[in-house]
Structures are given as structure tokens and as C-alpha cells.
């Protein structure tokens, strides 16, 4: 019942949310089955509500904690029109497990089970090769990069720049490591410069992930036009208390966001036209 509690909180706070529960065999087959059913029920419930503010996915932990039996159960119970959320090749152990137990690489196993597709979100993708990238591209599957989580867990650095260059829809996330997207933005910018030993890396790719990739990912699950200030689009706005010494203009906006702004400077938040926080005071909840 945890998904319904989270959905209730999302409704009360007015936050647009796409939810799923992490399926795995770590707590036994019964819990795995319950997890599959809770995801399926929440997906159907969100469709019935049809508010444009709540959506659902079939959540999975990672292939090394999900047996073929549970994969089959999830595939059989997933409602049409939605995809999966799964951690992929976050650690080298995930790859070693898949090769040892299934004789194939992780993305190949997911492909065989029909997991890939335009509504599926793959987290991390650190230990994948060119063939697997081809499969992700061919199936129009989405990827989310979580730089702080990968660094904090000492997992490694994913080939995110190559994913973007290949035209794979790639977004920027947190994996729950932080709730401040400006932190992920800053860390992603320097991580790939360091990893590639190239000071010119990531200047264009990271803004593309945050401001274009994330919007397109969200629009695959929500009906509204998102991420723009224009008539007909969802009124999602933040107001930032930012008064820089250096003038801000259309040519240097990204640098101001990257080097000057933080989440702590957000003073007002509007979601779907509803003011949620005004002058750092929560409006809709106690």
C-alpha cells in the first residue's frame, strides 16, 4: 500500500509524480508478487483518475535481483502503454551476475524479456557496451544519469556523453542522493570533464539532459506540454532569488545556473498553475 500513500501525499502537495514500487526477489517470491500487483494497480488507478498529475510505471530493482520467474510475472501483469523503471549496470557485479547466470549482457536480457521500449527508463547504464547502446537506441528506450549517486557509491562513470551523441534520450537524475537538481547539474558538468580528461566535455550535453531530456522523458508519461513558458503548456514555474554581480543575458544564462544558482535560492514554486510555496512558505500543506 505504500504507493497509494505516496500518491496521497503527492496529491496533497500538488506535485506531479510518476510512481512505481521496486520489484525484486530479495524478500521472497510472495513479496515480489505483491510488488508486481501494487505497481499494476497503481497504474490502473492513475489512469482512472486521469488528472494528468499522477502516472505509474512497472518498477524493478535490477536484473541481478529479479529471476526469470519474476520477470515473466511482471511482463504478464504490466498494463499496456507503460514501461519499466530499472537500475541497469550500476555496478560491475550486475554485469558479472548476468553473464554468469544467463550467459548474456544485461541489456540483452532485458531485450529478451521485452523490457526495453519508449516508455522504459534505465537508470545508470555504467557497464554497457556499444552493442547495448545500439539496442537502447533502436528501441527508443530512455536513460537517466545520476552522477552524485554513482560517485558516492564508487560505481564508476557511465558513458553518458556517448549516449547523448548517439541520440539516445538521456535525462539527469539523482537516484535519491540529493533533492537539489542544481547539485546534479554541477556534478555532472565536472565529472565527465575529469573522467574524459577533457575540459571541453559536457558543456552542451549536460544542459541538454536537464532542460531537454528531462522534459521529453516526462512528456512520455504526462499529457501536458512541459518545460516551457507558453500558452497551453503546464504552468510549472520556480522563482529564484538570484542577484548576481555579473550581468545575466541570453548568452550566459547556463553559466549563471551552473555556477551561481542553488536550490536554496528557490523562493516560490508553482506546479500546474497552483502555488505550492510562496516566499519560502508552504501554501498547500501544513
Predicted regions and their residues:
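C-terminal cap of metal-dependent C-N hydrolases
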Residues: 234-283
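His/Asp/Glu-enriched, well-ordered alpha-helical/loop segment
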Residues: 112-115, 119, 161-244, 258-262
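Histidine/acidic-residue-rich catalytic or RNA/ligand-binding cores of hydrolases
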Residues: 92-104, 132-137, 154-163, 178-196
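Short, acidic/turn-prone active-site loops that include or flank metal/cofactor-
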Residues: 22-25, 90, 147-152, 175-177
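Glycine-enriched alpha-helix->loop->beta-strand junction motifs that scaffold or abut catalytic
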Residues: 14-16, 77-83, 115-118, 135-144, ...
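Metal-coordinating catalytic core of metallo-dependent amide/deamination hydrolases
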Residues: 3-126
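Divalent metal-coordination and catalytic microenvironments
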Residues: 10, 58, 87, 122, ...
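Alpha-helical segments flanking ligand/cofactor-binding loops in enzyme cores
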Residues: 8, 72, 108, 133-134, ...
Amino acid at each position: 500500500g505504500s504507493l497509494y500513500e505516496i500518491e496521497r501525499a503527492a496529491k496533497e502537495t500538488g506535485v506531479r509524480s510518476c510512481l512505481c514500487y521496486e520489484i525484486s526477489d530479495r524478500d521472497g517470491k510472495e513479496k515480489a508478487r505483491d510488488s508486481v500487483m501494487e505497481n499494476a494497480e497503481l497504474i490502473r488507478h492513475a489512469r482512472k483518475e486521469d488528472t494528468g498529475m499522477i502516472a505509474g510505471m512497472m518498477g524493478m530493482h535490477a536484473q541481478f535481483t529479479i529471476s526469470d520467474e519474476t520477470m515473466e510475472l511482471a511482463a504478464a501483469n504490466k498494463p499496456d502503454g507503460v514501461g519499466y523503471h530499472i537500475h541497469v549496470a550500476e555496478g560491475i557485479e550486475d554485469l558479472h551476475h548476468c553473464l554468469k547466470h544467463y550467459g548474456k549482457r544485461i541489456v540483452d536480457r532485458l531485450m529478451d524479456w521485452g523490457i526495453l521500449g519508449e516508455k522504459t527508463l534505465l537508470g545508470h547504464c555504467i557497464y554497457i557496451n556499444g552493442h547495448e547502446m545500439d539496442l537502447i537506441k533502436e528501441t527508443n528506450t530512455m536513460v537517466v544519469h545520476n552522477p552524485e549517486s554513482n560517485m558516492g557509491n564508487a560505481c564508476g562513470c557511465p558513458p553518458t556523453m556517448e549516449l547523448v551523441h548517439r541520440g539516445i534520450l538521456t535525462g539527469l537524475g539523482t537516484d535519491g542522493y540529493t533533492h537539489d537538481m542544481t547539485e546534479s547539474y554541477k556534478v555532472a558538468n565536472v565529472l565527465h570533464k575529469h573522467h574524459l580528461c577533457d575540459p571541453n566535455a559536457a558543456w552542451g550535453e549536460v544542459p541538454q539532459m536537464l532542460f531537454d531530456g528531462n522534459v521529453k522523458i516526462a512528456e512520455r508519461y504526462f499529457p501536458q506540454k512541459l518545460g516551457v513558458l507558453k500558452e497551453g503548456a503546464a504552468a510549472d514555474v520556480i522563482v529564484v532569488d538570484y542577484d548576481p554581480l555579473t550581468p545575466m543575458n541570453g548568452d550566459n544564462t547556463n553559466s549563471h545556473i551552473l555556477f551561481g544558482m542553488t536550490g536554496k535560492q528557490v523562493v516560490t514554486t508553482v506546479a500546474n498553475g497552483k502555488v505550492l510555496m510562496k516566499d519560502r512558505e508552504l501554501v498547500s500543506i501544513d
